[in-house]
Amino acid sequence: MTLMQKSLAQCVAVALSLSAVSAFAATNLTGAGGTFPAPVYNKWAADYNTATGAQINYQGIGSSGGVKQIIAKTVDFGASDAPMKDEDLQKNGLFQFPTVIGGVVLAVNIPGIKSGELTLDGKTVGDIYLGNVKKWNDPAITKLNPGVKLPDSNINVVRRADGSGTSFVFTSYLAKVNSDWNSKIGKGNTVNWPVGLGGKGNDGVAAFVQRLPGSIGYVEYAYAKQNGLAYTKLLDADGKAVSPSEQSFSYAAKGANWSESFAQDLTYQKGDNAWPISSTTFILVQKEQANAEKGAAVLKFFDWAYKNGGKTTNSLDYASLPDSVVEQIRAAWKTNVKDSSGKALY
């Protein structure tokens, strides 16, 4: 090889190296928001890193925190279980799209009671969180559980202390099934809880329930399973006792009108074996991306997750979105997420 050829080869190698470094840096992304989807987002990120080398750092700080950070443009994407209203999206220049479907369950710590051995209905759950049902052997509970030996002990209520999309989903359900809750408390990421110990994040609530006998708390299903917590059955909209599962979360989404809006409320939906506290969870991105490479990289990551993350999604007890909805999302990316010149990033 001549000196000129060696020099040319070295220049090409350096150029390729610099190009690779630039591409790698462009795909290092940060996201923050709900703890509800954190298990699946973090596993997707690990698998994506293995497949592509790209680094995706997701922090489960709560949905309210995720919304604040994407509005402040301190993260590349935010995450929230509570969909933002259209006027708030427009005001802040944001676009939202769903990723997976999950379920909120009632985790309990009652000596001798295993998962699925206790059944509750919406009115009773609401009355527990209103502080009206105070004992585990209250008639409201025992009539739903004939033959189940329940202790004459206080119910220790656990709820979220932080702004939470999981709380939004849970209180949306309670507002539908308990008229007193609807009129006195309502729904939201944060509400004026009448009773209860506050835990930060799904993991904080799970930790309280795990160590506090007689407790009940609401958590995303994966957190109950990962922490070995017992969870209840719930009566669905048809009055049938249903267990939480990836399938029952999917059933809750069957009646959703996705073509009308991505922001579908899946709580207390009619349908055979539909879990009453099911929900989609959402990603928030800036509609106009100042950094086009990062904006495109966010969409590339979630596109990869839709194509390749289904097995992971289901293994962590979330349900995948219907294929038709994913295609609607991809079409929406083309018209809603652009660079500063107006060029589509997908």
Where are these regions (language model features)?
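Bacterial N-terminal signal peptides
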Residues: 11-22
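Flexible loop/hinge segments at secondary-structure junctions
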Residues: 25-346
